[in-house]
Regions:
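Short alpha-helical transmembrane segments in multi-pass integral membrane proteins
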Residues: 2-59, 115-180, 221-234
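Helix-terminus/linker motif at the lipid-water interface of multi-pass membrane proteins
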Residues: 1-3, 66-95, 99, 117, ...
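Small-residue-rich hydrophobic transmembrane alpha-helices
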Residues: 76, 89-147, 151, 184-198, ...
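Membrane-embedded alpha-helical transmembrane segments of multi-pass integral membrane proteins
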Residues: 19-22, 71, 184-187, 213, ...
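Hydrophobic faces of transmembrane alpha-helices in multi-pass small-molecule transporters and flippases
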Residues: 22-25, 43-74, 99, 103, ...
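Transmembrane alpha-helix boundary and packing residues in multipass membrane permease domains
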Residues: 12, 25, 61, 65, ...
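Membrane-helix interface segments
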Residues: 85-86, 200-202, 227-228
Length: 234
């Protein structure tokens, strides 16, 4: 039977559960020496002295992620006032833009681990070198994405939209968000590096303030006559 939207939801949950099951299975069955998690007791009590550091590092990031979702919902509500085509462009546009932020997120995760490892070993020169190399790579990648979005918005949009209204909105979206791709990539990478140093509180404060500023800025630009494009610029 056709499950439509419910089918997509079921498929997503099923896939996530299977990935989780495979990972847990491999953790407890892999005999590799590097598998330090094999003897892990997930439900055993651990020393109280670890609570403070776990809370100090993890809580700011958790709050940041939660507030980011809430802010995104508010912005989506604002976009919905401009019709179904605007919502579709926001959704698909975010997926198109993922070629930039997903890459940056991968570098951030790698740099997080690299920075933490070398910070613990007091190899500060390696931290600076790793950041410098990552900065160069992501700057080039971000500029390539910027050029593609700004110079080729219509061909890219045409891969996903065919009706004139959605196509026009998508072209504007790609041009506007295209200008920030390099900056966004470097931002995500830097957050990864600082988090590796244990500075998650600083990252979260900056991110929450600036991300939260999107809402009043979007309202201001929208009512200033920019319409939907005001939300994209925000």
């Amino acid at each position: 039977p056709r499950l439509e939207t419910a089918g997509a939801a079921i498929a997503t949950v099923t896939a996530q559960f299977l990935v989780f099951a495979v990972l847990v299975f491999r953790i407890f069955t892999s005999g590799l020496e590097t598998n330090v998690l094999r003897e892990l007791h997930l439900f055993s009590r651990f020393p109280r002295k670890f609570y403070k550091n776990i809370f100090r590092i993890g809580f700011p990031t958790a709050i940041q992620s939660m507030l980011y979702c809430m802010i995104s919902m508010v912005l989506t509500r604002m976009v919905s006032a401009f019709g179904a085509a605007a919502i579709a462009v926001q959704r698909v546009g975010g997926q198109i833009e993922s070629v930039s932020w997903n890459t940056a997120d991968g570098f951030a995760s790698a740099l997080n681990a690299f920075t933490a490892q070398n910070f613990g070993a007091k190899k500060y020169d390696r931290i600076r070198q790793g950041y410098r190399i990552s900065f160069g790579i992501l700057t080039i990648w971000g500029l390539i994405i910027t050029a593609a979005f700004v110079l080729l918005p219509r061909p890219i949009s045409g891969l996903f939209f065919h009706d004139p209204e959605s196509l026009g909105i998508s072209v504007n979206y790609l041009i506007i968000i295209g200008f920030c791709e390099a900056f966004m990539a470097i931002e995500l990478m830097t957050i990864g590096a600082l988090s590796g140093l244990g500075m998650t509180k600083l990252c979260s404060i900056i991110s929450i303030i600036l991300t939260g500023a999107r809402i009043p800025l979007a309202m201001l630009l929208t009512h200033a006559g920019m319409g939907l494009n005001g939300i994209w610029w925000a």
